[in-house]
């Protein structure tokens, strides 16, 4: 993950102050736009959907920033949580009734990875992405946040509202399943 997790306390104060909120929020968007886009993209796969997730994330964050009570070090986890929930809501709403669970959505998305990557994509990378999308949702979330975003377990716990020990087990199982799928 890009170094965006720690913002200065005075920047958080600027976000909470209605007179300075807009400028501070613009800086926040600049710092988190790219990491949140890639987080969303790994969940929803399609570029346009990821852009929608990020846009909705920042709209919700702007609307609620005045009520945010965490410290400066918790702001990134808060944004990731909003993005994660927004992406999951999008996946649940996609073609209602067609999927019985988010895991069904994951299987459909895995088949779309090859379409998104095109014919020139590295086959190993495509297989890796498809294997990730076939993981159970919780394992996929933990794997993406830990592997791609290099988030410490403590921050992942704040994003997902889970205990660190549970997340470590989920990550371990995800890695084992990926190794198994990729060595076949």
Name each model-derived stretch:
Residues 1-35, 42, 133, 155, ...:
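N-terminal module of bacterial RNA polymerase sigma factors
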Residues 2-10, 97-121:
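Internal acidic/polar
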Residues 42-45, 58-73, 93-95:
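Sigma70-family region 2
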Residues 63-67, 81-102, 121:
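Arg/Lys-rich amphipathic alpha helix in sigma70-family domain 2
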Residues 84, 88, 139, 145-148, ...:
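DNA-recognition helix of helix-turn-helix
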Residues 132-140:
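Short helix-coil-helix linker/hinge
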